[in-house]
Structure formats: structure tokens, C-alpha cells
Amino acid sequence: MYVSNHRSRRVARVSVSCLVAALAAMSCGAALAADQVDPQLKFAMQRDLGIFPTQLPQYLQTEKLARTQAAAIEREFGAQFAGSWIERNEDGSFKLVAATSGARKSSTLGGVEVRNVRYSLKQLQSAMEQLDAGANARVKGVSKPLDGVQSWYVDPRSNAVVVKVDDGATEAGVDFVALSGADSAQVRIESSPGKLQTTANIVGGIEYSINNASLCSVGFSVTRGATKGFVTAGHCGTVNATARIGGAVVGTFAARVFPGNDRAWVSLTSAQTLLPRVANGSSFVTVRGSTEAAVGAAVCRSGRTTGYQCGTITAKNVTANYAEGAVRGLTQGNACMGRGDSGGSWITSAGQAQGVMSGGNVQSNGNNCGIPASQRSSLFERLQPILSQYGLSLVTG
């Protein structure tokens, strides 16, 4: 086990296979996609990620490659597959990287850089499962509390399981790992500013209130048969809680799960109009689908408190140790967020809906926007499981 204050460990570079040729083959379609990106979204990506309009076509090409080749890459490397992600080069361009614990140094798939690492994804996931089991086995009032332990997840880029802890709580993280029985050599303890918490209960964007008491943000428009609705975070309200927008009752919470997961959907009255859009300041981003993006992909989020912010996906299958209980299967990004953004949308530049805001490492000012992007933990519940569990259809344009 090793301890760090920021992500510093890098796996060794091995080889690059035909990235230019692979991207050139997709250039026509990607250029069209870049032209379709909302101007306000381009501005936000440049502001938050340093992706300039001239770099956007090549980024979109790489993002498309990651989406279309992810399953094939995993099949190619089999049991020795150690993950894949999008990475930015020093010159500002992007590439798709795949890792393997085997000896192979290249891929038969064009446009994929291969890196050799120590542990397979299956080995790291096993350590992750031991941490989850250790947390589940704790008995409230009997077991030592997990105070100071924020979250844990597999990070393919550093080939480790990362356990995030509060500043000054490294010992708590070490104890947690030791008691779980996980292989400490596969784990990195990383300190994180702020305190992990869900993000409801402060005022603000496109918002809705719950029982005239707390405030959250709308996720995405959905339908269930003829019933209209929207998805949001489960911690925002209980079943049958009333949702209001602009003071008017628009519906009630039809179902929710929290903790364990952090998902819910609100059933709306028939008078409401569903739009396939996400607010982006004075403009809107059209929702075009719900294909999940890769680690390293650019992603933006919208909420009533901090508005429209962009970042990248930094981890998947994260377990968050909220005060209310552990929530599993979250995705982590580094777009900044604040209290009240809960339930709000996460979406890619290509209009692919990703999920709804859950929580993050919030500072005393109510957000994590002042924390360096490399240390932000902004967590969202994936959209696809919400749609599947409740039999919902995403409204797209």
C-alpha cells in the first residue's frame, strides 16, 4: 500500500499503434459532430478543460473510438485486460490507451496505445470487492466508524485501487484496508480536501423543491409508457414527496433508492412539457442518447447552484462512504459542483446523457470549485441503471 496527496504514479508507456491512421479514417463523421456541438458547450469545454475549438474534432474522434472499441479491446486482452481510458498528450491531442497485465505490447485494433501493468482489472476488482465487503460487515455502534474515509474505486490509469480519505485521516484509510483483508500492494491511499457529502439543501439554475423544504436539480426528461417524468438523485426525496418548480406542484417521487444507490424518478402531471435538453447558462444542450463515456472523456454537468461546469471522467464503480450509508457503482468526475446541484445532469459534448449528480468533497463554502481539479471528487449515479430499474425511456432530440 502506498500513500499520496495527489495522483502521481504512472504506468510505463509501451507502444503506439496507428493512431493517426485510425483517426483519419473517422475524420469526416467527427468533423460533422464537432460542428453540431453547441457554441456555449464549446466555450465551457475551453474554459474548464482547455479544449479549444480547433482541438475538438480530434477529441471527438478519440471519444468515438473509445465508445466503439471498448468491448473489443476487453475481448482482445481477455483475463489480462487491465482497463482502458482516454489520455491527453503534451501537445494537447488525445489518444485511447489500453492496459494489460500480460506481455503483449500492441493491439490488433487500430488507434490503441498499449501499456503493460502489474495487475489485471479482475485482480483490482477483487480487492475492491473486499473493501466493499469490509464496509458492509460493519455493525453500527459496535464496529469502529469509517470516519475520514470518503470513497474507494479501481483506477486503471495508476493500476491501483484508490481509497480517498479526508486530509489528516491517512491512518483511518490504512486501518480500513487492513481490516478488509484486501492486498495492500494493490491499494493507494489518497488524501482529498473537503468532506464527502450529498449536495441537496441549498438554494438556486433549473431547480425543483421537495415538500417546500429542500432544493435539488432536475436530471433528464423520461417517460414510462404514457407517464411523464424526470430522473434525479435518490437522496433528494422520499416516495410520494411533492416536487415543485417555480412554486407550482409538478409531480411526486414515484420511486427512489438511497443509500446503496442514489437514484429516483419523479412522476409528473400530464400538463408538463418534456424537452430533450440540458440547461447551459442562457442556452441548452440537446440530449441525443445515453451511451456511457470512457474514463478520461470530457463531460459536463448542470445544476441549480454552480450552473454548467465541465471536467473529465476520472473513475468508475466508485463506492462513496456518505454519512447516510455507502452508495456503490458511482462514476467520478472532476467538474466542480455544490450543494443543491444534486440530481442534476451529466452529459458529454456529443449529447450523451451520463447520469445524475450525487455528491462530492464539498468545502465549508458549499462547493468544491476552489479545489484543484486533480483533487475533486464529484460523483454521479449512472443513468442506464436508473432507466432499467424503473422501466423508463429517455427523451431525446
Swiss-Prot record:
S-S pairs: 216-236, 300-310, 336-369
The enzyme's E.C. designation: 3.4.21.12
GO CC list: extracellular region
Protease recorded as keyword: yes
Alphabetized UniProt keyword annotations: Disulfide bond, Hydrolase, Protease, Serine protease, Signal, Zymogen
Active site (catalytic residues): 235, 262, 342
Family recorded in the similarity comment: Belongs to the peptidase S1 family.
The protein's name in its UniProt record: Alpha-lytic protease
Organism per entry: Lysobacter enzymogenes
Taxonomic lineage from the root: Bacteria, Pseudomonadati, Pseudomonadota, Gammaproteobacteria, Lysobacterales
